Amino acid sequence: MEEMFCFQCQQTAHNTGCEGHTGVCGKKSDTANLQDELTGELIRLARAVAENERSRSSDELMLKGLFTTITNVNFNSDTVKKLSDEIREEAENRKPGKDAYNVQKIWEAPEDIRSLKSLILFGLRGTAAYAYHAWALGYVDAEIMNFFYKGMRILGEEKGMEELLPVVIETGKINLRCMELLDKANTESYGDPIPTEVPLTIEK
């Protein structure tokens, strides 16, 4: 079993990153490495979509792929691999011959570049969680979706700090916009949330 590297949550080993065969959260190295491969496939998809129009299928795969890789969401290696295969097929149908991006390049980049690209990547993953829940309720925002592709493409490009910093700021702005979208989706679907008493008894 290959070793892993993962440092996207605040509970990483020694506050530097989980290595070896199992993370602090229990994620196995094979799953962590498959999630890196999935991320590389998403970058390939983003590049392919840059030369074509995005579609409902590519949007769904982008959201599912990013959501699948956030902390403690999916530790099923078979599911992660299946999703990678679907993303690869979508990208191949759009732009044959494009290779998946090797995410190790991000982890091995100079510290400042690694930090900025990580902020973008982890921000996109978190935003995708909001966007996917809004998507499930039938709410989609074109500006948000377009930024997922833009952000993932930039991760696969050679960029300096001056070019990455504005994207980090934009990631934050898009995240707020997505939170507004999810709030709208929830309130229009379920009504305004109100304080409600609930029983605290333990039931079988």
What are the roles of these predicted feature ranges?
Residues 1-204:
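Metallocofactor- and cofactor-centric catalytic cores in central/energy metabolism, strongly enriched
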